[in-house]
Amino acid sequence: MANTFVFSSESVGEGHPDKVADLISDSILDACLAYDKTSRVACETFVKSNVVVIGGEITIPKLQDKKTGKTKPIDEAFNVEKVIRDAIRHIGYTNDDDVFHADTVFINNYLTAQSADIAQGVDAKKADGKKTAEQGAGDQGLMFGFAADETEELMPAPVIFAHRLGRELTKIRKSGKVKWLRPDAKSQVSVRYVDGVATEIVNVVISTQHTADVAHKTIESFLIKNVIKKVLPAKLLTKNTEFLINPTGKFVIGGPQGDSGLTGRKIIVDSYGGWGRHGGGAFSGKDPSKVDRSAAYMG
């Protein structure tokens, strides 16, 4: 008897509140590493309504005066507020009616230096009997990795299919050709497996934020034709495949205006979509000394 089951994985667009937080944290990280590649960064972001709160620990060696031991403020390296606003602008929260808007959000900065207790275990040191210095890890952790032969990306099919939908939706929105699309979006794909082989897509869910003046039928027909049937394998789409487009019927209020967002809340989306194990650590806002990120990438 065949072993049959259905497995579902989701993806979220860059305008989803949690992904907004992830991108802001990673943008701060990128700015730190661009200024000093030895920076130690653990940046968390919270977004809600028209507010951005960043906090965490950042140490940039180039800002430290070795003679006095004093550290210059992070704004000596780069403009933190500009980095945040540019990240939000990149996502697309720039419409006149956006409550969460790149130019008008309030920013609260609670970044401090990395704990000296942690730093002493992370900073590279030349160990006895070693020719080169070795860098320590900032913490312990559980990380898992594997490859699957279901897709070209060597990842499980459900999560890759969900990502493809999200990427195509973002591509169309940023092209400016479809004026009613807005940044917040989610997708989910359910795949039927028979004896370990993906045989059909059972259903596809896409929820996308939109302007108030577009009809649900317009959204539905456009996404099925120009997103779903464009990026998903035709051989897996059958007459029985169910398409659920904005199933609540309306998605005008979205992004941080509709829901709060926090760095690190989409760890399953960022990894294997629920296949295999996950140690619980998030990626965004962390420099390579944080094994949650670096070890997972190498896995």
Language model features with spans:
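Short glycine/threonine-rich loop-to-helix capping motif typified by GTGT followed
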Residues: 63, 248-267
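Short, charge-patterned binding micro-sites
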Residues: 43-64
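N-terminal, positively charged regions that mediate nucleic acid binding
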Residues: 1-42
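A generic structural motif
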Residues: 13, 58-74, 148-153, 209-214, ...
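Glycine-rich, mobile lid/loop segments that gate access to catalytic sites or pores
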Residues: 8-11, 82, 87-253
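Short connector loops/turns at beta-strand edges and beta->alpha or beta->beta junctions
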Residues: 2, 48-50, 59, 148-149, ...
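Conserved mixed alpha/beta catalytic, RNA-binding, or beta-rich assembly cores of soluble enzyme
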Residues: 60, 228, 262-299
